[in-house]
Regions:
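Extracellular/periplasmic catalytic domains that process cell-envelope and extracellular macromolecules
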Residues: 10-12, 21-23, 42, 112, ...
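Pocket-lining segment of extracytoplasmic ligand-binding domains
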Residues: 4-7, 35, 72-164, 168-169
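A C-terminal functional module that forms or caps the active site or interfaces directly
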Residues: 178-185, 189
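Bilobed "Venus flytrap"/periplasmic-binding protein-like clamshell domains
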Residues: 21-91
Length: 195
């Protein structure tokens, strides 16, 4: 956005500054454990939620699908928020959903307790394509047992969550925010578990 490239091509946004990098959000792809979907290739012909319209999740999902060769003709997509997507998956109304968020995401954990789930890993080819296409993507491993019933680690990509502030904010206000972030770092880490 700052340089007007990528998704912001031609739309330079320079009225803000980064205050701090917060945490890494994992691109999580959730399916029912009783499904026949074990890899991204298995999503062909399936009905999936790629996140709310114009969200970071939607952007990540589209880029992951493109890197896998799954065009909009090969998958049927919906723009559900996480709660809608989890409900739709639980009710067999969709086959998978994307969720870009910190791990231990509450909506995924609640779903896992209600209906067994599986998270899909990205293969090495997909990971390399994504990381070559954008410096914002990093290799990320979701540890085994992050969610109920998830007994294997999951290989995916992550994106850094960054706190931005308008350049109109006073330096004093930015200093107060920054100080609060670092003085309450442990509290914030604990609260992220419940996202």
């Amino acid at each position: 956005a700052y340089e007007g490239t990528g998704a912001f091509d031609g739309n330079i946004c320079k009225d803000y500054s980064a205050i701090a990098g917060l945490y890494t959000e994992a691109c999580q792809i959730v399916v029912r454990a009783d499904s026949s979907i074990y890899s991204l290739d298995d999503l062909q012909g399936k009905h999936i939620s790629i996140g709310a319209s114009e969200s970071g999740t939607e952007r990540n999902a589209k880029e992951i699908l493109a890197a896998t060769g799954l065009t909009s003709r090969l998958v049927q997509t919906e723009n559900y928020d996480y709660t809608q997507a989890a409900n739709q998956l639980s009710n067999h109304e969709i086959d998978a959903f994307f969720c870009t968020a910190g791990t231990k995401t509450t909506i995924i954990e609640e779903l896992a307790k209600e209906c067994p789930i599986r998270l899909l890993s990205l293969n090495e080819t997909c990971l390399k394509k994504l990381m070559a296409s954008s410096p914002s993507y990093i290799h990320y491993t979701i540890p085994a047992n992050t969610y109920t019933g998830q007994d294997k680690e999951v290989t995916t990509i992550g994106v850094k969550s960054i706190l931005l502030a308008s350049d109109d904010l006073s330096e004093d206000t930015v200093n107060i925010i920054t100080k609060a972030l670092f003085e309450h770092n442990k509290d914030l880490q604990l609260s992220l578990i419940h996202i």
